[in-house]
Amino acid sequence: VDNELLYNEILMMFEEKVVRFWNNGLIDIIIDNGTPYTTSVLDGTLVVPDNGLAVIAAQSVINGMNFTADTVLMNPADIVSTMFTQDTLGNSRLLPYMQNGAINGMTVFSSNAIEIGTAVVMDSTVYRELHSNFILRFGTYNDQFIKNEKSAIGEVFSILRIAVNNLPGVMAIDLDAVKASLLIA
């Protein structure tokens, strides 16, 4: 029984590592395909822009191109700094656009695969992802049979699809650069 429990724990850790690697790979592709921020209706209009307002500016650009931005991917550190801001006296600011884990109605997802200072704002319907179940295989190579060793390979096969016409529905933004654009000159 102990060996079976140990095997199941090792298998679960192995599967989690493969799935995390797979998720990070998908995020990397989405970031690489993301359209850069250009300009929005909020540019040059804000006194104290923050991460949340930068994300909303990107949302306005995406929505202006007939997409519906409904998802934000951010580094956990950026999410915390977005949620907890203070005024000049040190009082916590209540942000009307930040409620129930959402920014202006967009669901926020946290991932360390996103660099600090970067956010992805997107219409989640523009990507389609198909994948296999987690596959675990065992085998031997070279002299492993002689040494009584085996190798384990964990895999997930995945296809991430997006039509070229839908690429503007995903925007990868540098939060500081967008905040600088939003600032009143």
Specify the residue positions occupied by each region the protein language model found:
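Protruding loop/beta-arch "assembly-hinge" segments enriched in small, turn-prone residues
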Residues: 143-185
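Extended oligomerization regions of viral-like shell subunits
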Residues: 38-156, 161
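Composition- and surface-driven signal marking solvent-exposed, interaction-prone regions
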Residues: 6-7, 85-88, 164-171
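Alpha-helical scaffold segments that mediate packing/assembly in large oligomeric complexes
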Residues: 1-64, 178-185
